[in-house]
Amino acid sequence: MLFDAFTQKRSRKITEEGGRTMQAVVLFEDGRWTNFKPLTWTRPVCLLRTGIFPLWEKVARACQAAGWQDFEVHIHTRRYLAPTLRHCLTGIRDKGRGTGRWKGVFVNELERLEGKSALFVNGRLLVTPELAPQASALEEGTAYLKGNELLAIALGERATAKVLPALQKGEPLTDADLQTLLDAASRRVEVTDALLLRYPWQLIDHNAELISAEFALATAGKESEGKLEQGAVIYGGDASRVYLGKGAIVHPTVVLDVTHGPIYIGDGSIVYPPTRIEGPAYIGKGTWIVGGKIREGSNIGDVCRVGGEVEESILHGYSNKYHDGFLGHAYVGEWVNLGALTTNSDLKDTYGSVRVTVEGEGKVDAGTKVGCFIGDHVKTSIGTLIYTGKRIGIFSHLHGVATDDVPSFTIWAKSIGGQGDAVELLLDSALEIHRRVLARRKIEATPEEAELIRTLFELTREERSKAGVRQGRPQL
């Protein structure tokens, strides 16, 4: 198990009876972030989700469970993401203060670590509830590795000061940077059973079991405050397996099936008939389920609009799948709109292994049940079909059938008319569509977001060039 190796006592433990705790936890990003594209074009790996909590929060909660108090959470990521990420995390930062959990969440503000002890954690590390309490046995001056990959390293004030220059460049850590961290440790421990995520489909593979495992953590000290209307049914278990947040409403004839796992429905969410939700399932705040078949392992973020059939899929906030269609074993980013009857495949006709293209590795076997990976701000037209294992780049528009990976900022219509077409989405169009979409949710687009979109447009030019995407107007 991940923290089993932390029980050796050759150096001082971080948490002891009457002792001190670390003053900060730092989630660092390494070069493997590219494996998770297009999802990580717009966020660090540690903000990806599986189960109820994102990866960074699983780490922070593990530290809390170990008895840490009044500590800071730091996210280290690419420089171009920092301004927008700080803005998005403002609510988390304010919420964190004074709660007895952590003092705040800070992005690339590593100067705050001067004079502090810190636990540096690889942002790809998956910490489960079973392992979290064992974090109390972490030892200062120790680096924890799996093979040749760094999982975590606990450093005192002086050692932390020595490694800060490696992180203050605002770029993912290189092998040389990681070696700088390792050199600051007085000893190393091999951890064989840790799970350091390498591919995006692993998030989906572990999602259902983590929703079940984290349900108790997410509902600890809380009672359901929502309304289960007369005629709504909890099937396969009792009400303790369902959590309804404040203002949540489940309408008559809706079925909540908890036979195989719990169901969490966040504050202000509404479930309309005819809907059947099978646990384990997580639905965030302010989301509407509008006549859907929400199958086991569904993980739907805040302020989404979801109908049709969803199975074993993860959706970030503000994404819409309002109409009929199927979404299976898929990972969907923020502000995505899937048009009516959009359907993805998650199983080959041959029942063979799905091969996903990973940057720097080529085709990688991902298992037999693999859907698609859809980046932020993607739009699909009515009747769009997406083949197994396809990656749909950020800000792209899909028409027809996607049998290949789709580059970012692309109007993709290769299956429509004649030889089809793939045309670059104009930057000005992307900015204006972004403004309109946010306005529909009564959110004002920020200058930081506009600058991020401009940067991403330039960073993804090579994707479009390699795929033969042309400039001009689409020929539909």
Named regions from a protein language model:
Residues 223-239, 243-245, 249-333, 348-349, ...:
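Extended beta-solenoid/beta-helix repeat architectures
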Residues 2-238, 408-476:
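Terminal amphipathic alpha-helical/low-complexity segments used for targeting or macromolecular assembly
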Residues 117, 253, 395:
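Conserved beta-strand and immediately adjacent loop positions that scaffold enzyme active sites
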Residues 32-35, 47-49, 291-292, 303-474:
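Glycine-rich hexapeptide-repeat left-handed beta-helix
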Residues 18, 63-67, 214, 220, ...:
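Generic detector of bulky aromatic hydrophobic side chains
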